[in-house]
Each structure stands twice: as structure tokens, then as C-alpha cells.
Regions:
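N-terminal assembly/interaction segments in proteins that build large macromolecular machines
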Residues: 1-190
């Protein structure tokens, strides 16, 4: 990943933005200085002898999009915000890189994921000898508490803010002028 390769990758990323590309397939057809991106990638492959390509393509549309690249270009995060807030966007993107939330909030987690987690919790509780003989209502209440703990750990807004563990990300966003995260994307190599 020398400077030449990084510049090559950046030129492709710039072309994706400039051409409002929405998919990897569409990106392969974009022209840069008269050459298709797919042909440029094949030429680069021939010169470096390693298979390269655009394996994943993410795009966010928001009033403001912040980005963060972590770990020698091995992970990237995009965060859509309701307004321009560069420092807040970078802080939130770093949070996402570090804590890998599943969604912005509990309402954004797919129903099948919630049901799968609920089933795991209930199955685990059924196998727990301490739960034997407990009323179903009590088991259901405990399961909901465990599900809420799952949301706290796995949703961005409910997570403890990594730069100040005394507040949640949601509280940080409010204190920064009611900044709202509209969506995020986290992509890691490997």
C-alpha cells in the first residue's frame, strides 16, 4: 500500500463521488481520464500481481457526512448527520470504529435480529438452574431487561461515549447542539 496505490484508490473514490455512483457495478463503468475504472483496476492488477477490486461500496446521503479511516486504511466509517458538525462527526465515527454498533438506535435494528437475540436470551435462561420454577411473567421481564442491555451495548445512541464514559453518545450529541445521526456505515477489511 504505497503512496502510488493510495493515490490510485483515492482517484477511484473521487470519481465515485463526482459521478454520484450508487453501486460497485456502476463504479466499474465510470471513466477516469478516458479509461473505465474496471480497466484501470485490471491494469493495476497486472502491474502489482495481486488481485484487487472494489469489494464493497457504501454511500450515505445526509445534510453532512463525516468520515474516519482507522488502522492503516483497514477500516472506514461514514456518518450521516442532520447538519455540519465536523468535530462531532469525527468523534461519532471514531466511536463506531471502536464499538461497532449494529444500528443508530433500537428502532433501527431489524425485527429478525431482535427476535433472534430474544430467543437466545430465553433459551439461555431456560437452561439456567436458577431460573427453574420461576413464573413465566418474571422470566419474560428478566428477558426484556437483558434485551435492553443488548440494545445499550449494540446501538450507537445508547452506548457509553468512548471519549467520556460518563455520558451516552445520545447525550454527547445533544450537548453538541442537537446533532442527529441519520445513518452510518462501517466497513473493515478482512
Amino acid at each position: 500500500k504505497n503512496a502510488e496505490f493510495v493515490a490510485f484508490a483515492q482517484s477511484i473514490a473521487d470519481a465515485a463521488v463526482a459521478n454520484n455512483v450508487k453501486s460497485a457495478e456502476e463504479l466499474n463503468e465510470v471513466l477516469i481520464n478516458g479509461a473505465k475504472v474496471s480497466d484501470m483496476i485490471n491494469d493495476k492488477l497486472a502491474s502489482i500481481g495481486e488481485k484487487i477490486g472494489v469489494a464493497k461500496f457504501e454511500r450515505i446521503e445526509a445534510a453532512y457526512v463525516a468520515s474516519y479511516i482507522h488502522g492503516a486504511n483497514r477500516m472506514g466509517v461514514l456518518v450521516g448527520l442532520n447538519k455540519e458538525a465536523a468535530e462531532v462527526g469525527k468523534d461519532v465515527a471514531m466511536q463506531i470504529a471502536a464499538m461497532n454498533p449494529l444500528a443508530v438506535d433500537a428502532n433501527s435494528i431489524p425485527a429478525d435480529t431482535i427476535e433472534r437475540e430474544r430467543a437466545i436470551i430465553i433459551d439461555t435462561m431456560k437452561e439456567d438452574p436458577k431460573m427453574a420454577g420461576k413464573p413465566d411473567e418474571m422470566v419474560a421481564k428478566i428477558a426484556e431487561g437483558k434485551l435492553n442491555a443488548f440494545f445499550k451495548e449494540n446501538t450507537l445512541l445508547a452506548q457509553a461515549f468512548v471519549k467520556d464514559g460518563g455520558i451516552t453518545v445520545e447525550a454527547y450529541l445533544k450537548s453538541a447542539g442537537d446533532v442527529v445521526v441519520t445513518e452510518f456505515k462501517r466497513v473493515a477489511l478482512g
